[in-house]
């Protein structure tokens, strides 16, 4: 579940619209676009309506959702599919957590952060996150805090084989 933002001409002026996309992958690995919705903003109510529409169209159960960091996703998913697991998109997490990292530190910080999200196991990832916090926590506390506070939805994929 994600959005693609684009400019459209409406009433002789350009405005930004979003196409909200839900891509599904079945147990055989086949990908299907389950729907595209045009809208103006994302909210829990919007995504809950989308998920309920998918249920109405025949989706009975969802094993795993991969989403960006919007809190509205989590709320809607937990309401519509309470047994589904959630994995936050690592790219979205990296972008949001490093947005205020100085250019002079970004390369070194990213090398250390990569050891967290590319670890082989959750235990290794947690150990690397502790090392990351020890090294960068005083300089970039919001970056470290973001990874710690979102760990439950950043580490979901460790439960599955690579």
Where are these regions (language model features)?
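Structural beta-strand/beta-sheet cores of well-ordered domains, especially the beta-sheet scaffolds
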Residues: 18, 63, 87, 96, ...
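Conserved beta-strand -> loop -> alpha-helix junction used to position metal-binding or nucleic-acid-contacting
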Residues: 64-71, 76-114
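Conserved, well-folded catalytic cores of nucleic-acid-processing
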Residues: 53-57, 79-83, 97-100, 104, ...
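Amphipathic alpha-helical transducer elements in NTP-driven molecular machines
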Residues: 16, 44-48, 67-74, 103-110, ...
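Acidic/histidine-rich catalytic cores and adjacent linkers
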Residues: 118-162
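Hydrophobic alpha-helical scaffolding
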Residues: 37-40, 63, 99, 115-118, ...
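Short acidic (Asp/Glu) and glycine-rich catalytic loops that position anionic groups and cofactors
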Residues: 30, 90, 108, 152-160
